[in-house]
From Swiss-Prot:
Organism: Homo sapiens
Major localization class: endoplasmic reticulum
Entry GO CC: endoplasmic reticulum membrane; endoplasmic reticulum-Golgi intermediate compartment membrane
Protein name according to UniProt: Transmembrane 6 superfamily member 2
Family: Belongs to the TM6SF family.
GO molecular function terms attached to this record: identical protein binding
Amino acid sequence: MDIPPLAGKIAALSLSALPVSYALNHVSALSHPLWVALMSALILGLLFVAVYSLSHGEVSYDPLYAVFAVFAFTSVVDLIIALQEDSYVVGFMEFYTKEGEPYLRTAHGVFICYWDGTVHYLLYLAMAGAICRRKRYRNFGLYWLGSFAMSILVFLTGNILGKYSSEIRPAFFLTIPYLLVPCWAGMKVFSQPRALTRCTANMVQEEQRKGLLQRPADLALVIYLILAGFFTLFRGLVVLDCPTDACFVYIYQYEPYLRDPVAYPKVQMLMYMFYVLPFCGLAAYALTFPGCSWLPDWALVFAGGIGQAQFSHMGASMHLRTPFTYRVPEDTWGCFFVCNLLYALGPHLLAYRCLQWPAFFHQPPPSDPLALHKKQH
């Protein structure tokens, strides 16, 4: 997978978030939630106009360029918020976390800001750079799509269902377009042609003739997917208040964060159970039986989603903003960390396997009628 150069123009534009946020933080009129929402919408609108004016050719070639440019700006804002909440910087975004979206001050909110300000930011620059040079960015787009969708679905649902539901301000409604963007962007990314592979028909036939036992790496991934599926189901039952002793011990001694009334961990586990659990079963099937050409794409999507989710979940479980009673106990910290780290790494190994050795997932080549006729006679 080729890594496209980063978009310098968008990088420079996104860094304007630093002086803008600092200046707005000292405007006394922004102490009212409605003014915060209106000013935020105005800034994003002006930013979109600026991007369209400065990069009309790129936007005409691929409208997602404008989306990536605006989101790169918001990623820098999110990184500022995370650094501010952890007391690394001061005087930038206090007005927004107080009057705009106070739930960003939770441990979960801090870590999704860290992820958005680092991983998503680099993805935006890479994808925008690819558009500038008329190159493909399909694989980066699929990973971003999964990560972005998981982040926004868990965060918005947790805001509505958790203890911060009474703290929803007008700025919350600015996130509604964030629900629509993944749908549109997903269709655009999936419609892009796949990168060409060097798999010949003979290579595909040879690879697809091998059984699962002849492919030890795939066998290991299937075993992982089965174990991950059981772990996903178990944690889903835990947050659904399953009365068994195993669930009781786990939620109190291993992951008490699942009881946190902010609701983000509960929503996250249910997302895993309803979406990741079926994917584990389907992926295990695709690694066993050849010709499942859908797996490489969806492996990237789920790798992005699970990577983002596990980063936020693990970080929030140990962060000081999480009440002490809901943090991971010291005596079970090692078990918690290893299990959750493996849960995050597995989908990335699956995606890497699918991208590097895709022959097994290609559609079987059509049989040669002439060769078949000679064989029969």
